[in-house]
């Protein structure tokens, strides 16, 4: 149990690999154009999955912590802290998802000639940087949440 930190590191690692591969295929022009498009869509979907897992983790652990506080008479501070954890990650994860959708959509617009210049590329670089920042914040908050869950588990074990 409590493996979310490791799971998230694995998800984020492969997300970074996909970001690098997608950007490389877009810059290098050594591949067929469809490879960059396919990799971009795959990377977009995988990024949405990664952030969705983080959102689901905080929904689930928040409910579990709230139930533990009520059932075992633990301090209400635990429930307050879990709400704060959720608040620190939800906005970033949601905005990261919206931005990745926008950059994939703009890639499609560029492909059909609705978008000229480097708009898609520059937005993609920004979105990758923003996602890396989001991953860093999400990992830190997941670690804090895991520490709090361990603390709650220890308190419950000591009461028994």
Q: What is the predicted role of each segment?
A:
Residues 2-10, 78-102:
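Loop-to-transmembrane boundary segments
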Residues 18-25, 92-116:
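Alpha-helical transmembrane segments and their membrane-interface junctions
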């Amino acid at each position: 149990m409590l493996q979310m930190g490791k799971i998230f590191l694995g998800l984020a690692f492969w997300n970074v690999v996909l970001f690098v591969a997608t950007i490389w295929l877009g810059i290098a022009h050594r591949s067929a154009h469809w490879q960059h498009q396919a990799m971009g869509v795959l990377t977009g979907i995988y990024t949405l999955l990664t952030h969705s897992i983080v959102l689901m983790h905080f929904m689930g652990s928040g409910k579990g912590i709230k139930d533990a506080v009520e059932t075992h008479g633990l301090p209400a501070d635990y429930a307050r802290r879990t709400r704060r954890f959720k608040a620190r990650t939800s906005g970033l994860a949601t905005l990261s998802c919206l931005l990745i959708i926008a950059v994939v959509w703009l890639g499609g617009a560029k492909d059909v000639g609705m978008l000229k210049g480097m708009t898609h590329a520059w937005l993609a670089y920004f979105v990758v940087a923003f996602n890396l920042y989001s991953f860093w914040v999400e990992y830190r908050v997941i670690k804090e949440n895991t520490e709090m869950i361990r603390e709650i588990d220890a308190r419950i074990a000591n009461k028994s």
